[in-house]
Amino acid sequence: MILLVGLGNPGKAYAGNRHNIGFMALDQIARDYSAPPFRSKFNGLISEITLAGERCVLLAPQTYMNDSGRSVGEAARYLKIEPKDIVVLHDELDLPAGKVRVKTGGGNAGHNGLKSITAHIGNEYRRVRLGIGHPGDRALVHNYVLGDFAKSEAAWVEALCKAVAASAPLLAKGEDDAFQTKIFKDMEAALGKNVP
């Protein structure tokens, strides 16, 4: 069993924010694999699918980003899931827009959602870092991540969420390198020379 977590802030006001790309990718996975409707549990919204023969619990914490660990910790304890079987989809400032990297453990790179999760379950969980680019100046970061994606970014955001969903079975199997490679190829196929 794996716990697949998408990070974001709840509510319509935040729905299109760059910080919510984890929610967007999780929603795409739920749609593409015909997940039952999300229901409230663990201070979040949960559903369940099967990926590559693995039971996969989908979790969108509803605690606001900075307290995501409360929801993830609660789910992990109840489901008796080890950190190595938890995969967190989140926005990543330090990657160019549309790029994806998977890593296990390590620091939080200033990401408050990851900081909270690490405080609750330790840092040995897997992270799917979804690149949103950087505004160029640290002083602009807060407004940038809490700002909506521009209309000009819609094509790559949609292509990235679809590519993550299409490659999700590889994540479930622990084939992180193959997951990254497939996303790169899918993005290239979808956007051609317009890959960001």
UniProtKB/Swiss-Prot annotation:
EC number of this enzyme: 3.1.1.29
Any one GO biological process: protein quality control for misfolded or incompletely synthesized proteins
Pfam families, sorted: Pept_tRNA_hydro
One example GO MF annotation: peptidyl-tRNA hydrolase activity
Purpose of the protein: Hydrolyzes ribosome-free peptidyl-tRNAs (with 1 or more amino acids incorporated), which drop off the ribosome during protein synthesis, or as a result of ribosome stalling. Catalyzes the release of premature peptidyl moieties from peptidyl-tRNA molecules trapped in stalled 50S ribosomal subunits, and thus maintains levels of free tRNAs and 50S ribosomes.
Site note Stabilizes the basic form of H active site to accept a proton, residues: 91
Classification via InterPro entries: Pept_tRNA_hydro (IPR001328), Pept_tRNA_hydro_CS (IPR018171), Pept_tRNA_hydro_sf (IPR036416)
Protein's UniProt name: Peptidyl-tRNA hydrolase
A GO cellular component annotation in the UniProt record: cytoplasm
UniProt xrefs under NCBIfam families: pth
Reactions accelerated catalytically: an N-acyl-L-alpha-aminoacyl-tRNA + H2O = an N-acyl-L-amino acid + a tRNA + H(+)
Keyword Hydrolase on entry: yes
Binding-site positions, tRNA: 14, 64, 66, 112
